Amino acid sequence: MAGHSQFKNIMHRKGAQDARRAREFAKVIREITVSARSGLPDPASNPRLRAAISWAREVNMPKDTVDRAIKKATGAGQGDDYAEVRYEGYGPAGVAVIVEALTDNRNRTAADVRSAFSKYGGALGETNSVSFMFSRVGVIRFPASAGSADDMLEAAIEAGADNVESTAETHEITTSVEDFFAVRDVLESRFGAPEAAKLDWRPGTTVTLDQDKASSVLKLLDVLEDNDDVQAVYANFDIPDDVMQALSA
């Protein structure tokens, strides 16, 4: 019985991982669809589509899946029509939360997001109710093996980046929104494809959470991220290492 139970647990975890991977693929395909329709279907002349393809590489989406998504987005009929929507609100302990969505039904998505906030002790606010607490920036990440810290810093600053942070594992470059695509293209031509390249919301200050509040905030974020319409979730919290270890136990 123990072996059988262990097998069931392994299969349950694998099933959960497969479901999460499928949801992530669906989000990437939705972004490819919108970006392909927002300009030419050629990534060489469509910066947003290039960023979507970079996201697809980040999650190991097969190239033929990407190609089919682009073809479907720009073909006859073109399928679903998605609207870009941003929701803002407060979670437990006053944590500020930004939710970015692509939806074909605004009423459904708004109701789902509002329900998630309410269930976990938060409240959905008005547009711009919390975004003033964040900065919108471009983030480009390369593995440390792509080049030395000095080479990456020099190339990034020359290309117009705002900052570079290098560790033993990665180089992370931040840019303004306006310079993001240009900086990414320059660095990609020199160092190869980045591990990740996206626009991000970075908090100016963070809220430190105890174990109870951290658990509630993480549950809220999980529910939001598992929603098919939600593309990304950002929040201004910090969880101390000892609290994170206790939650993982």
UniProtKB/Swiss-Prot annotation:
Pfam families: TACO1_YebC_N, Transcrip_reg. Transmembrane segments: none annotated. One of its GO terms (molecular function) is DNA binding. GO terms for cellular component: cytosol. GO terms for biological process: regulation of DNA-templated transcription. It is found in: Cytoplasm. Keywords: Cytoplasm, DNA-binding, Transcription, Transcription regulation. Coiled coil: none annotated. InterPro entries: Integrase-like_N, TACO1_YebC-like_2nd/3rd_dom, TACO1_YebC_N, Transcrip_reg_TACO1-like, Transcrip_reg_TACO1-like_dom3, YebC-like. HAMAP family: Transcrip_reg_TACO1 (MF_00693). NCBIfam families: PRK00110.1, PRK12378.1, YebC/PmpR family DNA-binding transcriptional regulator. Belongs to the TACO1 family. This is Probable transcriptional regulatory protein GbCGDNIH1_1097. It comes from Granulibacter bethesdensis (strain ATCC BAA-1260 / CGDNIH1). The lineage of its organism: Bacteria, Pseudomonadati, Pseudomonadota, Alphaproteobacteria, Acetobacterales.
